UniProtKB/Swiss-Prot annotation:
GO terms for molecular function: DNA binding; DNA-binding transcription factor activity; protein domain specific binding; zinc ion binding. It comes from Human papillomavirus 52. The keyword Metal-binding applies. A motif (Nuclear export signal) lies at residues 78-86. One of its GO terms (biological process) is symbiont-mediated perturbation of host cell cycle G1/S transition checkpoint. A zinc finger (unnamed) spans 60-96. Residues 1-42 are annotated as: E7 terminal domain. This is Protein E7.
Length: 99
Protein backbone atom coordinates (compact mmCIF):
# COMPACT_ATOMS: atom_id res chain seq x y z
CA UNK A 1 0.00 0.00 0.00
CA UNK A 2 1.26 3.39 -0.89
CA UNK A 3 -0.24 6.70 0.02
CA UNK A 4 -2.38 7.86 2.89
CA UNK A 5 -5.53 5.90 2.06
CA UNK A 6 -6.01 2.26 1.20
CA UNK A 7 -7.59 1.44 -2.13
CA UNK A 8 -9.24 -1.76 -3.35
CA UNK A 9 -6.12 -2.57 -5.41
CA UNK A 10 -4.09 -2.74 -2.19
CA UNK A 11 -6.05 -5.71 -0.85
CA UNK A 12 -5.68 -9.27 -2.08
CA UNK A 13 -9.23 -10.35 -2.79
CA UNK A 14 -8.61 -13.72 -4.44
CA UNK A 15 -7.51 -15.71 -1.37
CA UNK A 16 -8.92 -19.21 -1.02
CA UNK A 17 -9.10 -21.18 2.25
CA UNK A 18 -6.52 -23.92 2.61
CA UNK A 19 -7.44 -27.36 3.88
CA UNK A 20 -5.43 -28.69 6.79
CA UNK A 21 -5.03 -32.31 7.81
CA UNK A 22 -6.10 -32.57 11.46
CA UNK A 23 -4.96 -36.15 11.99
CA UNK A 24 -2.01 -36.76 14.26
CA UNK A 25 0.35 -39.35 12.83
CA UNK A 26 2.72 -39.39 15.81
CA UNK A 27 3.78 -42.87 16.90
CA UNK A 28 4.04 -43.31 20.65
CA UNK A 29 6.20 -46.02 22.15
CA UNK A 30 4.92 -48.58 24.63
CA UNK A 31 5.23 -46.91 28.03
CA UNK A 32 3.81 -49.76 30.11
CA UNK A 33 7.33 -50.81 31.16
CA UNK A 34 8.35 -47.32 32.25
CA UNK A 35 7.60 -46.08 35.72
CA UNK A 36 6.40 -42.51 36.06
CA UNK A 37 8.85 -40.93 38.48
CA UNK A 38 8.32 -37.24 37.82
CA UNK A 39 5.56 -36.95 40.45
CA UNK A 40 3.09 -35.34 38.09
CA UNK A 41 0.26 -37.84 38.55
CA UNK A 42 -0.96 -39.32 41.80
CA UNK A 43 -2.52 -42.80 42.02
CA UNK A 44 -6.00 -41.29 41.76
CA UNK A 45 -5.12 -39.76 38.38
CA UNK A 46 -5.06 -36.15 39.56
CA UNK A 47 -2.11 -33.90 38.79
CA UNK A 48 0.00 -32.89 41.78
CA UNK A 49 -0.25 -29.19 42.59
CA UNK A 50 2.76 -27.09 43.48
CA UNK A 51 3.13 -26.16 47.12
CA UNK A 52 4.69 -23.05 48.63
CA UNK A 53 5.24 -21.37 51.96
CA UNK A 54 2.67 -18.73 52.89
CA UNK A 55 2.82 -16.28 55.78
CA UNK A 56 -0.42 -15.27 57.48
CA UNK A 57 -0.78 -12.38 59.93
CA UNK A 58 -3.99 -12.39 61.96
CA UNK A 59 -5.24 -11.49 65.44
CA UNK A 60 -6.03 -13.60 68.48
CA UNK A 61 -9.78 -13.95 68.93
CA UNK A 62 -9.51 -13.49 72.70
CA UNK A 63 -6.85 -10.84 73.40
CA UNK A 64 -6.36 -9.21 69.94
CA UNK A 65 -2.60 -9.83 69.95
CA UNK A 66 -0.91 -10.23 66.58
CA UNK A 67 -0.37 -13.82 65.43
CA UNK A 68 1.97 -14.84 62.64
CA UNK A 69 1.45 -18.21 61.00
CA UNK A 70 3.57 -19.91 58.37
CA UNK A 71 1.93 -22.67 56.36
CA UNK A 72 3.12 -24.92 53.56
CA UNK A 73 0.20 -25.48 51.23
CA UNK A 74 -1.16 -25.41 47.70
CA UNK A 75 -2.80 -22.24 46.46
CA UNK A 76 -6.19 -24.00 46.42
CA UNK A 77 -5.90 -25.04 50.06
CA UNK A 78 -4.73 -21.54 50.98
CA UNK A 79 -7.94 -20.13 49.47
CA UNK A 80 -9.93 -22.64 51.54
CA UNK A 81 -8.16 -21.48 54.71
CA UNK A 82 -8.81 -17.87 53.74
CA UNK A 83 -12.53 -18.55 53.39
CA UNK A 84 -12.55 -20.29 56.78
CA UNK A 85 -10.74 -17.36 58.45
CA UNK A 86 -13.21 -14.93 56.90
CA UNK A 87 -16.06 -17.13 58.16
CA UNK A 88 -16.46 -18.63 61.62
CA UNK A 89 -12.95 -20.03 62.20
CA UNK A 90 -11.14 -18.09 64.92
CA UNK A 91 -7.46 -18.41 65.87
CA UNK A 92 -6.22 -17.93 69.43
CA UNK A 93 -2.69 -17.33 70.72
CA UNK A 94 -0.90 -19.96 72.87
CA UNK A 95 -1.49 -17.89 76.03
CA UNK A 96 -5.25 -17.75 75.51
CA UNK A 97 -5.36 -21.40 74.45
CA UNK A 98 -4.15 -22.47 77.92
CA UNK A 99 -7.02 -20.70 79.68
Amino acid sequence: MRGDKATIKDYILDLQPETTDLHCYEQLGDSSDEEDTDGVDRPDGQAEQATSNYYIVTYCHSCDSTLRLCIHSTATDLRTLQQMLLGTLQVVCPGCARL
